[in-house]
Amino acid sequence: MDDAAARLRYTNVAIFLHWAIALLVLFNLTTGLLHDVVPRAVFAFHISSGVTILVLTLIRIGWRLTHKPPPYLPMAKWEYAGAKIVHFLLYCAMLLSPLTGWAMISAHADKPPAAAIQADAGPQPAPPHKPHRTMIWGLFVLPKLKPIADIANQPGGDAKLKETHELYEERHETMGWIFLGLLVLHLGGALKHQLIDRQRELARMGIGKPAERADSSL
């Protein structure tokens, strides 16, 4: 690879982060938007994958801030502006989608409603209720977001916590559809440059032969 081609290619770290996040996002969008038909054993990894996406995205942002990305290939000004906007929104989605999911989990009640406890107890005392725990890859417990979990300690906390859970569940699902739309735009733009403009766009992310020159005007 010559120097000019190397300048148009992302670093190996950026390429790894890009494809690792892409695969995890594809898994999560599939298991999330199709959760009614996805086997429970497969969906069990949805949360672990989401937390991993959040961590890798933070690493990717840190890497991007400390390592200048390569210049864009030649394109019209409107395409350049569109690419910048879509990239920014994708980063927002990679952060907000896992965070809304985390908030939803944090709004999961640690204890059943008092009425349910009394109904189950019968003549005998109810057994101790185990707090709901979310394991990440079976290695550690995902802590709850304290401001949300503490809602349970407020007057009428059970009802408020349920409302909060439903709110973030709706937001999380909405983020999934927004994320899917952004990915369609991102992939469509990349394929347009690769197949129609005959530019080696995919080579910038490690697929195929590298591009040969940059657009000096960008």
Placement of each model-derived feature along the sequence:
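Membrane-embedded alpha-helical bundles that constitute the cytochrome b-like, heme-associated redox core
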Residues: 1-218
